[in-house]
């Protein structure tokens, strides 16, 4: 029987180490493939979700005179196209609409028997949300650029916009943006604006 020199392993030890390495290598490859598969599926699902509401968004854009790309950007920012999304403050659906705003739309458009559950309907949510966005854009039409004011109002509310829109910022959007002391609202405006450019 051959003697082993110090530091040498028997035949079984020599075979076991490469097998373990091969197993680990295969596991790494399988894990990598699983991650890539999940990423491709997520990309495909996201694109499908974004396209699903294009017809309704076009309808809302035509009805209310709001840019198609802007409506789509607000939906992306608010809910990532999840029609069952519910916000911490009770915002509902694709455009994260407050119930009161939805009822205002229903009243203005003569929609009878309007109920809370109707706000979850994608078409109703997009039409009512676009109507609400349009009223905000109209509210600040006297400014050099109504968009940041309207988005700030949509995100943070009228009272905060009034506080930020003082002196020159009343009509100057650059000054207005500098006055916004909520980083989340500044980020919201920036992300919606960039996403709108992406959809144009």
Model-predicted regions and their roles:
Residues 24-34:
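Hydrophobic H-region at the start of alpha-helical membrane spans
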Residues 89-112, 128-132:
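Substrate-binding/active-site groove segments that recognize
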Residues 1-24:
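N-terminal Lys/Arg-rich, disordered targeting/topogenic segments
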Residues 148-200:
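Catalytic and substrate-binding regions of cell-wall glycan-acting enzymes that process beta-1,4-linked
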Residues 55-59, 68-72, 100-103, 127-134, ...:
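Solvent-exposed, polar/charged alpha-helical surfaces in well-ordered, non-transmembrane soluble domains
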Residues 80, 99-107, 156-160:
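Glycine-rich, acidic and aromatic/proline-enriched surface loops and short helix-turn segments
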Residues 34-84, 88, 106, 111, ...:
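Export/targeting segments at the very N-terminus of extracytoplasmic proteins
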Residues 51, 61, 65-69, 88, ...:
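Soluble non-cytosolic domains of exported or imported proteins
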């Amino acid at each position: 029987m051959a003697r082993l020199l110090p530091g040498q392993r028997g035949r079984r030890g020599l075979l076991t180490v490469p097998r373990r390495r091969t197993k680990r290598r295969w596991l790494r490859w399988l894990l990598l493939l699983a991650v890539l598969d999940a990423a491709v599926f997520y990309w495909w699902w996201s694109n499908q979700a974004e396209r699903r509401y294009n017809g309704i968004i076009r309808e809302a854009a035509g009805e209310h005179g709001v840019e198609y790309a802007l409506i789509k950007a607000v939906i992306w920012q608010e809910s990532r196209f999840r029609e069952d999304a519910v916000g911490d403050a009770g915002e509902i659906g694709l455009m994260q609409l407050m119930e009161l705003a939805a009822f205002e739309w229903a009243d203005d458009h003569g929609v009878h028997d309007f109920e809370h559950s109707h706000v979850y309907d994608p078409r109703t949510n997009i039409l009512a949300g676009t109507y609400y966005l349009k009223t905000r854009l109209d509210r600040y039409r006297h400014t050099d650029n109504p968009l940041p004011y309207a988005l700030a109002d949509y995100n943070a509310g009228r009272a905060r916009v009034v506080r930020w829109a003082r002196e020159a910022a009343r009509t100057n959007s650059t000054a207005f943006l500098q006055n916004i002391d909520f980083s989340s609202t500044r980020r919201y405006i920036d992300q919606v604006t960039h996403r709108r450019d992406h959809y144009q």
